[in-house]
Amino acid sequence: MVSRFWLKLNIVVFILISAMCVALIGCNEENSTNPDIKTGEKMVSEEPQEVQDIKKTVKLETSMGDIIIELDEQKAPVTVKNFIRYAEEGFYDETIFHRVISGFMIQGGGFTVDIKQKPPHAPIVNEAGNGLKNDRGTIAMARTNDPDSATCQFFISQKDNDFLNYIKDSNPGYAVFGKIIEGMEIVDTITTVKTTTKNGMRDVPVEPVVIKSAKVISVK
């Protein structure tokens, strides 16, 4: 009787232990093949955050109104960096648009009100081959006959000036590095002022058109 009792007990214990092992193995397999079920946290994939395109802009406060320029740092990185450097240093403050031609462009950034040239930094490489065109409302670097001679002076086109665009290395063009996004009507007004010859330079406004300040700002 005793031996049968222990035999039955051992059988019951064996069955219980086997059942527990099966259950444990089942749990482990479920957790290993479905790691996200336990907490639910890993099942939620994070959406990639949208990268905001921040454009650098410069506001020219002039004696005839404000002009806001959006800079194309992607197409003209060297030129934009150069322009921002001058603006942040206050170089353009109290300079003038010293060359104004109606139906063509306005040029400034290098002379004081009394027509004295400011000493610039070293010249930069010409980025005119960047695909940007000298269309109405664009800003580009002025230079001498040497393509890589641009320093501080710039011009804003009042009309499409295709003849200023890059064609090939032998016709290198003028480097566009931004466009007017506000105040093009101010540019148009500036082109209507009376001009004269001063200090050997033609097309100088009789009444100075002053760049009071050039401030770097950013917009989305």
Regions found by a protein language model. Name each.
Residues V2-K220:
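Cyclophilin-like peptidyl-prolyl cis-trans isomerases
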